[in-house]
């Protein structure tokens, strides 16, 4: 909270925060050797939203990590839906030689990872659509970066909402 408070006092800060989640399930995070819990992640998000009411929270979510059960995946999916993200990069775990997870039991099949990816991507899209609906009708400063087509300019708001202007 102290660091977030200092950030909130900065005039030149764009309120878009990328916080890598990896999984919304505590058991999966422990197997990944991550040193945070979903509850701690949620608390950080709540603190950011309190300090920056219109901030965008983006993340990375992995599906199909070694040993991820259907129940654990369900927890992660529910967490992503609950937290409400502006955007999420969803990817499937891929086994890599020499890593700790290489020899772990419970490797998830390619087909199952594809199924889980599709479900997680859909949840992420729903969160993104809800975030974007909240931006509609707002008057915002936009940094236009390029002309996309004749008469069409492309840029971003302070919270990294993509804007096209004709």
Regions found by a protein language model. Give the residues of each.
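Terminal RNA-binding accessory module
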Residues: 103-166
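Conserved non-cysteine loop/helix-boundary elements of the Radical SAM core domain that shape
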Residues: 1-87, 93-112
């Amino acid at each position: 909270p102290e660091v977030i408070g200092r950030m909130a006092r900065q005039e030149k800060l764009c309120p878009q925060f990328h916080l890598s989640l990896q999984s919304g399930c505590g058991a999966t995070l422990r197997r990944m050797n991550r040193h945070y819990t979903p509850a701690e992640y949620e608390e950080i998000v709540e603190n950011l939203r309190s300090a920056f009411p219109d901030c965008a929270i983006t993340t990375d979510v992995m599906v199909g990590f070694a040993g991820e059960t259907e129940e654990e995946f369900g927890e992660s999916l529910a967490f992503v839906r609950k937290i409400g993200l502006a955007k999420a990069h969803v990817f499937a775990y891929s086994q890599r030689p020499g890593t700790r997870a290489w020899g772990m039991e419970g490797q998830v099949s390619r087909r199952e990872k594809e199924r889980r990816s599709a479900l997680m991507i859909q949840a992420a899209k729903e969160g993104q659509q809800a975030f974007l609906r909240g931006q509609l009708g707002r008057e915002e400063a936009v940094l236009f970066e390029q002309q996309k087509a004749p008469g069409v300019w492309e840029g971003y708001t302070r919270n990294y909402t993509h804007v096209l202007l004709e």
